[in-house]
Structures are given as C-alpha cells and as structure tokens.
C-alpha cells in the first residue's frame, strides 16, 4: 500500500538528511571560513565542470516528459528549464564569472581534469536523468535544490561568506545569489510534483531510488570540490550511520537498517 503524500515526503527527507548540504565540508568550510580564497577557486572549477552538463540532463528530463505525455509535469519541467538555461546568460555563463575574476579562462576550465567525485556526480546525474522517467529526474534534483535555496538556505550563507569574508565581487559570487533566489522554488515545485504524481507503490519506489541516487551524486560532486582543493581522495561520510534496506535473513524481505553495527 502506498504511503500518504506527507509520509512519503517525510521518508524522502530522511534520505536527504543523511548527508545534509550545510554539513558537507565544502559548504561548511566556506561558511566557517576554513578554506582559502585560492582553494575555493579550485573547487569552483569542479563546480563549473559539473554545471556545464546542466543542459544535457535538463534536456533529458524535458524530452522524457514529452515522450511520456506527462502533461502535468511539463509546466514544472519547463519552468526549471527556462530558469536554468533561458535568458541572456545561462548558469554556465554565470559560473564563469568567478573563474574569470580569478584569471581562469573558459578554455582553461574546460581543460581541467575532473576530480573523482566530480566524475562520479556527472555520470550519475546525466545517466540517471537519461534513463529514468521525467518524474524520477525531477526527484533526483529536488531535495538538493530545496536545501540550496531560500534566505536561510546553503547558497545564501555561502554567498554572504564569499562577499563578506573572502572579498569576491557580487558578480563573481552571483551563481550562489541565483541559487538562493531560484532553488527554493525549483525544489518546492519538484517536491509538490512528487506529492501529486508518486501515488502508487511502484512509482514511490522509483522516486525513492531516484532521490537516493541524487543525494549520493551531489554529495560526490562536493567531495570533488574538496578533492581538487586538497589533492586527497576523500569521501565525506555524512552525519550518521548509512541506512540501507537489506535482507534480514528471516524470510520477510528487506528492512531498513543501518549498515553499521
């Protein structure tokens, strides 16, 4: 029997909160002023390498919504697509503003090696949006974007630190201002779509797996920022034990339990 929309969203938040954005060393280090300006620029090169794939995976979500005749989802998909890619400047263009201020050209950024975490994130996000339904693609992004946006969200706090402590110009840090303004709406609309459309057992399971994929993928991306800054292959473990549904051996199917004992 499917969960109620409220109970299902609450369950999905428990997945996202295993690796909360605000606690990841990339964001926390900026907010608490533990990284140097030079390290942040190296991390932002990795950010750029992932963001330049936005048109690819948003395109897959849009195409899937049309091919699936998911008319109710199309408005959400197109709103997000236009905010990300429409207008005179895309998010990729805005990302480049910080790199340009640091003396890094687009050609130099394009030639940079992706860190292990960055590579994993790109493959997981692009592949996930290509091979899964439009609803699953939105779910993959939703709980990360919802944490990013808003006046008290991660992006707003990072923006204040970049401007106030590190001395980046508003133009250089603009990508975080835009995330603060737009991502709360993106995430909220996507979560509302999950409430509306994920109403069967099978759809809820697909969305559950997509959210897990997205949470892991973006966590890998931020690991990639830190890997590029430090030169160390490290993976952030999150704030608690890894919760996985695993067989119990009692013949009753999988149950949710910690992987650590």
Give names to the regions the model predicted.
Residues 1-261:
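Non-heme di-metal
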């Amino acid at each position: 029997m499917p969960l109620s929309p409220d109970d299902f969203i609450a369950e999905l938040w428990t997945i996202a909160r295993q690796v909360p954005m605000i606690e990841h060393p990339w964001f926390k280090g900026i907010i608490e002023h533990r990284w140097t300006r030079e390290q942040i620029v190296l991390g932002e090169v990795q950010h750029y390498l992932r963001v330049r794939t936005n048109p690819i995976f948003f395109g897959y979500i849009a195409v899937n919504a049309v091919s699936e005749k998911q008319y109710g989802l199309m408005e959400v998909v197109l709103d997000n697509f236009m905010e990300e890619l429409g207008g005179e400047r895309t998010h990729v263009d805005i990302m480049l503003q910080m790199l340009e201020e640091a003396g890094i050209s687009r050609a130099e950024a394009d030639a940079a090696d992706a860190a292990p975490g960055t590579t994993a994130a790109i493959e997981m996000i692009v592949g996930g949006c290509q091979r899964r339904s439009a609803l699953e693609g939105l779910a993959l992004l939703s709980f990360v974007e919802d944490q990013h946006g808003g006046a008290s969200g991660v992006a707003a706090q990072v923006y204040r630190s970049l401007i106030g402590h590190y001395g980046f110009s508003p133009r250089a840090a603009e990508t975080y201002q835009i995330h603060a303004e737009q991502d709360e709406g993106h995430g909220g609309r996507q979560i509302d779509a999950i409430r509306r459309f994920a109403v069967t057992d099978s759809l809820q399971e697909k969305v559950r797996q997509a959210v897990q994929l997205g949470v892991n993928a973006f966590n890998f991306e931020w690991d990639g920022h830190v890997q590029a800054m430090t030169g160390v292959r490290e993976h952030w473990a999150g704030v608690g034990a890894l919760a996985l549904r695993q067989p119990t051996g009692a013949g009753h199917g999988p149950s949710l339990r910690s992987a650590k004992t």
